[in-house]
């Protein structure tokens, strides 16, 4: 820009920001703009207040008074981000305009870096800046944006028509030529919401220009704030129906259709961008929690109709080669085949698992339409699979693909589908790539590497990576005395930090009735359950994390737990020095009623215990989301049900003196598990501000509930979920409410004492029903939780149709149901008693026995254990210490193994 232009008051940059109720972030935004090292006389800020109801306007006007030459503030009625930005654009005078969001920040040299690049590359049509993720809660900056690859290699100008893996669609982190926007009458389209209005404008702008020349300026760093309360437009968009209709129709589809009409084919960079956008629709569903989706009913139907049309504009080779962000093969198969209304199947089958004990191999392949005609040729003969199922692969309310799963005998094997043999592979092959980019070619076709003179470690050795403790454990675990004690051991555990669940009940059964089994129980030393079990005389209780635990785990053949968390199934301390060879039995913590398939499918579960026919069918049957078949899944009942039945029979109707209120947790209440732990900590101030705390405390403090309990002669008890118990001591509970914890009480006795049980979604209700006690469900957040807001998705169980008691949606309704139940007495109403009987037709006290037999049966006739090569004894000081410890360990193990 010439000095003459500057003297005339022209601006190089216009920063347009649409402001709506972001007062808590505005000071950071203002400070970031004020801190720019670029001449302020070349910059203007146009802040459009979009009808804010907080103090945003007051803050902006104060800024305008302080910086009148920089800041212009205008206001309008609330109409959305697009209309606010468009208003600002009409007022802009800058050569280049950007649309910085008011809850984000820019680094001090942001404008300077962009200006330097533009002076060097004046042919640039669009500038994209580098988005750095800002954690709102911690303030930590992380360079982990999914498109950070676009900024590798320094600041570059890319012709994205020639380099179609590059694109840019974020208007706040982009700079546009104002004259081009005006020439082509380009503005934000308010019909494209709640998201993608940025990408829609960026793409139309690039399609309108003579060249698609995008400058990727990595040194201009834009701090994108990820809000801790998940309240940003992007973070909340998945719960908005327009995300699944208007965005596809007015955004993706209009771009593809318009560009195809002009040139006969949508540009490849645009196809890549749309595939990138579509990938988030899939990944949002592939979460353990099963993210909420508004794509249900009519919205789901329209979403899939639009997606089907979108796929007609996407080239097969572009879909197949897409790797700009991780893209599961199944997502690509859906885009390629699910919407074409013609049968299809993989031209191969994978063999993802082998069970040597049962002599079976697992085969799987995906298909669309009807199941192909199958011929499993084993040892030269056509055989039927020992176990088989069809798994449905569904997204946003529609089954799009199927996976065929079959277990067949482990012999020479061939599979024919519709009369043609298919490849058998250990894993799915990559898609054929018909176009290679220069960088790919350089990586794939390299000149021969020079031979390194650096000595390489011996193949397969792990000793240099092991601590001396792990080296000692690795050596001791292979010695004869240790193997005599722990060889072929069955390790049982509930949580790391507590017991008193199905694993403990099965352990007790084994020690009393199956002494031939080398059974051990694991729990953290010093916990109440550790002290209790040791006080009862159980010497075979091993402290989690101890050397003894490591030796036990290195030699066990069965790991049996009521929990399937990684610290239980794949403990890092064991993986550090040993390769597990155990079979894993999942006893479960309760009866599964929701769809937990995304969480459980990746886990290596050899035996999966279920308790009801509905639960079994929902996991092992056809046309559900689980990857488990009749091979792994068995209907036995939970081991803890045996003792529960005994306890239930101890307390007659006159002895049931408790209204037990026991809600489950919510995944947004607590932080993630720490590595190697099963404990979670909650901030009390954050907890009390939640709807969860407000509703449950309102129920516990209800005067009507207190009066009803007093009239019925019962006590109100509160038993929060273990993940929430850390706040129990700080809750201001009324004096008539008695607080219980899982650590300090026999919870089965609490269940048995209950005249009434109140919960929200907890599977504890199945325990209560098992002993014929009444239940009330309090589901104030049912729309959120049941549509994927918590762990899992809606499953086969419908609380109104299948539940064991009435369902309330607010505090008053819950109190009314509780009062009615107390008037009726401590037994379920007839309609719910009938459901209980249908759910549990067999209650015979033999669940432990059935589980034991299934573990024996699933292990097969052959021993799972493979001969272990002895670990060389440590040398030097470590060796002397090890030999001394070995003598001590042998004496200790002889006593402990009794």
Q: Can you say where each PLM-predicted feature lies in the sequence?
A:
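A conserved acidic beta->alpha catalytic loop
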Residues: 49-58, 80, 101
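Catalytic binding pocket for nucleotide-activated donors in carbohydrate/polymer assembly enzymes
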Residues: 629-630, 730-734, 761-842
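Conserved donor NDP-sugar-binding/catalytic core segment of glycosyltransferases
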Residues: 109-145
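Glycine-rich, basic loop-to-helix element that forms the pyrophosphate-binding segment
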Residues: 75-92
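Conserved catalytic-core segment of nucleotide-activated headgroup transferases in glycan assembly
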Residues: 265, 271, 498-518, 639-730, ...
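Short, well-formed alpha-helical segments that are part of the catalytic scaffolds
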Residues: 22-36
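Active-site and donor-binding regions of nucleotide-sugar-utilizing enzymes
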Residues: 374-375, 475-481, 486-645, 668
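Short aromatic/hydrophobic "clamp" motif used to bind/position activated sugar donors
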Residues: 97
